[in-house]
Amino acid sequence: MEQQELFDVTVIGGGPAGLYSTFYSGLRGMKTKLIEYQAELGGKIHVYPEKMIWDVGGQPPITGAKLMEQLVEQGLTFNPTVHLNEKIISITKDVFGNFVLEAESGMIHYSKTVIVAVGGGILNPQKLKIEGAERYEVSNLNYTVKSIERFKDKTVIISGGGNSAIDWANELEPVAKKVYVTYRKDCFTGHEAQVEQLVNSSAVCLLNTTIHKLIASDDHHRIASVELIDCTTNETVALEIDEVIINHGYEQDAELLANCDLDLQQVDDFYIAGTASSESSVPGLYAAGDILSHEGKVHLISGAFQDAANAVNRAKKYIEPEAPKVAMVSSHNEVFKKRNRELIQEMVNQNR
């Protein structure tokens, strides 16, 4: 199926870099499309919705969920065309020099320019390799912690020894009834301070162990207990639990760039080699966020915003060489004049 409509810019990836690219391209009057693989916008922040984020300039500490909400609202300011659940698998060019984006669904998208903002690629959590485990994903087998409240007063076992697993254990220890942490190696690999906090807490750390079996409840809808096996002695022990959390890392899906039929230079066979202005080796194709690699690259959400603005400005000049290099700042931009009046009136009404 083809989307015959030609867009000025198509943004691939709906995380912070992609959402800000979408906002800024709308600000620059560009006909914009945003394509996201997941069912909702927000990107990797979905992995830690209740974690506090401190390093966005001018923004007081904010939860990942709230920041996502604000980023999505801002990204949709200029009513871009949005495609969710759409995985782009290849990028080519047609005879007219326009980009042709092929989706796994068979959909074809056309665009004058492209901004790749896929972060570290499509991240799929590594699943628990136990037969039949997937049936518990609708009940109490978790691959992320979306709400700490869900685990209040419950017995929880976390499998994993990296930063995320240790962070989750420390977050849940004060609210859960009991926290177990099982890890197949003899020491955790998370940040030293976080590991120290964990081992000095009430959580029970079970090193050199791994989940061997899931034992179902009487109705077979939930996991009632887990059987751990000691990796050194092969001894087993069963623990009654309410919730199981698995954090064994993520699998990176880099199919998009691997199938890019263009002379796109990469770093480490994954990241897009670019410039500080977000340009790639392919004219008209830009990168923003963690997927962009160059000397001096800042891997922060704040850095992604600058990448996005640079990418959009370059895309605008690529399409319209006579266009200004940058957009008018928002405080003096006529685009926001009507909305500013509405916001000021809202503030006046709230203060009455």
From Swiss-Prot:
Residues that hold FAD according to the record: E36, K44, Y48, I88, L123, D290, S331
Cofactor binding notes: Binds 1 FAD per subunit.
GO MF, one example: ferredoxin-NADP+ reductase activity
Cited InterPro entries: FAD/NAD-bd_sf, FAD/NAD-binding_dom, Fd--NADP_Rdtase_type_2, Ferredoxin-NADP_redctase_2
Cofactors demanded by this protein: FAD
Enzyme class: oxidoreductase
EC number assigned by the record: 1.18.1.2
Record key words, sorted: FAD, Flavoprotein, NADP, Oxidoreductase
Catalytic reactions on record: 2 reduced [2Fe-2S]-[ferredoxin] + NADP(+) + H(+) = 2 oxidized [2Fe-2S]-[ferredoxin] + NADPH
A Pfam cross-reference name: Pyr_redox_2
Matches recorded under Gene3D superfamilies: FAD/NAD(P)-binding domain
PANTHER family cross-referenced by the UniProt entry: THIOREDOXIN REDUCTASE 1-RELATED-RELATED
Similarity comment text for this entry: Belongs to the ferredoxin--NADP reductase type 2 family.
Known partners and oligomeric status: Homodimer.
UniProt name for this protein: Ferredoxin--NADP reductase 2
Source organism per UniProt: Exiguobacterium sibiricum (strain DSM 17290 / CCUG 55495 / CIP 109462 / JCM 13490 / 255-15)
